[in-house]
Amino acid sequence: MRKTLRTLLVSVAVAAAGVLPVSTARAADGYDRCPDGYYCMFSGLDGTGDMIKLRGNAPDLAALGMDDRAKSDWNRTPSTIYLWSDAQYSGCTAVTSSGPTGKGNFFPTYQNFFSSVQFDGPGGPSCGTPPGEGR
């Protein structure tokens, strides 16, 4: 009886192992964490670190834990994104376009710099391109 039960249990275990799927998927990392249709900011370079994802305006990034912390971004929306140096859409602005140019690291001068995010403008005075930092 014991031998029959053990044989049955081994047979069931082998059959289950052949039926159960093996997951090889891995979690998204870096920029790939940003879902389509969102604008994402990252606290690290190249889409690393903490991430926030937005589908609309954010007048104060402090409320989202990203005030003066972002180092990279990806605009996966059809909108033009205006990044403001100060909260409540004040100070100067930099622009992140949609499409393939809307992904990357901020110029070193503008890392840990932005405090609010506005979708589709009107924008404000340009923060400019820092000398020697043309993309």
What residues fall within each predicted segment?
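Compact beta-sheet-dominated domain cores in extracellular/mature segments
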Residues: 2-11, 16-135
